[in-house]
């Protein structure tokens, strides 16, 4: 199914800690990375395996290793950077592509202001990471960029998602699988996810304004 809400007990517990109003930058970063690792486990369950033989301590040992398409991780600036280490902890050999998106104040649509994709991105599984799927505009723009670059297998990992954004993305890109720790209640009048996490970018980079 295109949208998968992963309700593993560890994810539910760590997500509850992430939602606290009073949380340090250090704790938010660590928890975001931990939840990302758990989402990565789910998002990669269908990777191809091939039989492989190695030299073990008692001689030849039959094992398996990942084969097929290689992976590129695609963090959306800036908040997506906060999830990057969580993926790399499990897939340290993955290449990283970067997309910068911002809202055009005239059209209110997302536009690309930075793009640095690996040269062979079309031949890789592209895993987009961004803490929040709110209105869906940024994610749709990111998927559009990757498809225009030849990507055929695109997956998305977000910490929390709003139903409005999920519906919008699925209408435009129904084949793209989305993995999230929570489908929240919805968006408020300002376009923020409720209950959400607050401004994930500010919390990850320590730029939260104090009263």
UniProtKB/Swiss-Prot annotation:
<feature type="binding site">
    <location>
        <begin position="130"/>
        <end position="138"/>
    </location>
    <ligand>
        <name>5-phospho-alpha-D-ribose 1-diphosphate</name>
    </ligand>
</feature>
<feature type="binding site">
    <location>
        <position position="193"/>
    </location>
    <ligand>
        <name>uracil</name>
    </ligand>
</feature>
<dbReference type="InterPro" id="IPR029057">
    <property type="entry name" value="PRTase-like"/>
</dbReference>
<protein>
    <recommendedName>
        <fullName>Uracil phosphoribosyltransferase</fullName>
        <ecNumber>2.4.2.9</ecNumber>
    </recommendedName>
</protein>
<dbReference type="InterPro" id="IPR050054">
    <property type="entry name" value="UPRTase/APRTase"/>
</dbReference>
<keyword id="KW-0021">Allosteric enzyme</keyword>
<comment type="pathway">
    <text>Pyrimidine metabolism; UMP biosynthesis via salvage pathway; UMP from uracil: step 1/1.</text>
</comment>
<dbReference type="InterPro" id="IPR005765">
    <property type="entry name" value="Ura_phspho_trans"/>
</dbReference>
<feature type="binding site">
    <location>
        <position position="103"/>
    </location>
    <ligand>
        <name>5-phospho-alpha-D-ribose 1-diphosphate</name>
    </ligand>
</feature>
<feature type="binding site">
    <location>
        <position position="199"/>
    </location>
    <ligand>
        <name>5-phospho-alpha-D-ribose 1-diphosphate</name>
    </ligand>
</feature>
<comment type="similarity">
    <text>Belongs to the UPRTase family.</text>
</comment>
<dbReference type="GO" id="GO:0004845">
    <property type="term" value="F:uracil phosphoribosyltransferase activity"/>
</dbReference>
<feature type="binding site">
    <location>
        <position position="78"/>
    </location>
    <ligand>
        <name>5-phospho-alpha-D-ribose 1-diphosphate</name>
    </ligand>
</feature>
<comment type="function">
    <text>Catalyzes the conversion of uracil and 5-phospho-alpha-D-ribose 1-diphosphate (PRPP) to UMP and diphosphate.</text>
</comment>
<dbReference type="GO" id="GO:0044206">
    <property type="term" value="P:UMP salvage"/>
</dbReference>
<dbReference type="GO" id="GO:0005525">
    <property type="term" value="F:GTP binding"/>
</dbReference>
<feature type="binding site">
    <location>
        <begin position="198"/>
        <end position="200"/>
    </location>
    <ligand>
        <name>uracil</name>
    </ligand>
</feature>
<dbReference type="GO" id="GO:0000287">
    <property type="term" value="F:magnesium ion binding"/>
</dbReference>
<dbReference type="GO" id="GO:0006223">
    <property type="term" value="P:uracil salvage"/>
</dbReference>
<keyword id="KW-0342">GTP-binding</keyword>
<dbReference type="InterPro" id="IPR034332">
    <property type="entry name" value="Upp_B"/>
</dbReference>
<keyword id="KW-0460">Magnesium</keyword>
<keyword id="KW-0547">Nucleotide-binding</keyword>
<keyword id="KW-0808">Transferase</keyword>
<dbReference type="Pfam" id="PF14681">
    <property type="entry name" value="UPRTase"/>
</dbReference>
<dbReference type="InterPro" id="IPR000836">
    <property type="entry name" value="PRibTrfase_dom"/>
</dbReference>
<keyword id="KW-0328">Glycosyltransferase</keyword>
């Amino acid at each position: 199914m295109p949208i998968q809400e992963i309700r593993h007990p560890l994810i539910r517990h760590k997500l509850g800690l992430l939602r606290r109003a009073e949380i340090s930058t250090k704790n938010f970063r660590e928890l975001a990375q931990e939840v990302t690792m758990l989402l990565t486990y789910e998002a990669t369950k269908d990777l191809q395996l091939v039989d492989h033989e190695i030299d073990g301590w008692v001689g030849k040992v039959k094992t398996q290793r990942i084969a097929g398409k290689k992976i590129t991780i695609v963090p959306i600036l800036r908040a997506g950077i906060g999830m990057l280490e969580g993926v790399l902890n499990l897939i340290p050999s993955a290449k990283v592509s970067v997309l910068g998106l911002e809202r055009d104040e005239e059209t209110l649509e997302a536009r690309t202001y930075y793009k640095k994709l690996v040269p062979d991105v079309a031949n890789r599984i592209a895993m987009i990471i961004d803490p929040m799927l709110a209105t869906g505009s940024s994610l749709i723009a990111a998927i559009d960029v990757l498809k225009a670059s030849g990507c055929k297998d695109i997956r998305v990992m977000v910490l929390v998602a709003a139903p409005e954004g999920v519906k919008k993305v699925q209408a435009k890109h129904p084949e793209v699988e989305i993995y999230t720790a929570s489908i929240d209640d919805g968006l408020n009048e300002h376009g923020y996810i409720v209950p959400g996490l607050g401004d994930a970018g500010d919390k990850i980079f320590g730029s939260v304004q104090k009263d």
